[in-house]
Regions:
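Solvent-exposed loop/turn and edge beta-strand elements of beta-rich ligand-binding domains
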Residues: 1-166
């Protein structure tokens, strides 16, 4: 059964690579209202970039969210590209809002059940990503969403979202 939270609360997932002392990812996942909107389910992935040794600057790091066929796929469809804010938050939905809702933007919209695979990569080709004092990450963050149709309501729901990195 899907997790049901009180209005305004959203589940958050965090992981940290303690070996390299780099916070790998933080995701917040939710549908904008929990109600069907023309049988579309929206999911809002986020990551957090941490920088050791000094304060992170807004726009200092660039990231790409790519939909792929599976985790071994290195090419795929670019869903969104954006940079971090002054707190390190990387908010793909603000860069490519497909929900039409400005208060609850989302960059992923699903119109049919299925399992969907994504990769998040740090894009060091962007301008400003050449600070010689910073060791840029080549880590790939992967995540999967599982979209199912609720038999009782017919509504599409994200029943599972999991992630990893390598």
């Amino acid at each position: 059964n899907p997790l049901v939270l009180p209005e305004g609360e959203h589940p958050a997932f965090y992981n940290t690579d303690t070996y390299d002392l780099i916070s790998a990812a933080s995701y917040s996942v939710y549908a904008a209202s929990g109600e069907p909107v023309d049988q579309v389910c929206y999911v809002d992935p986020k990551i957090v970039k941490n920088l050791e040794g000094r304060a992170i600057k807004s726009g200092e790091f660039a990231f790409k969210l790519i939909q792929v066929a599976n985790y071994n796929d290195t090419e795929g469809e670019l869903i969104s590209a954006t940079t971090n804010d002054e707190f390190g938050m990387v908010d793909f939905d603000k860069a490519n809002n497909v929900s039409g809702d400005l208060e609850n933007p989302s960059c992923l919209a699903y119109t049919k059940p299925g399992t969907y695979y994504y990769r998040v990569i740090e894009d060091t080709s962007k301008g400003g990503m050449n600070d010689q004092s910073v060791l840029y990450s080549d880590q790939v963050i992967t995540f999967t969403t599982v979209i199912e149709q609720d038999e009782a309501t017919g509504q599409l729901v994200c029943t599972d979202m999991y992630y990893g990195w390598w």
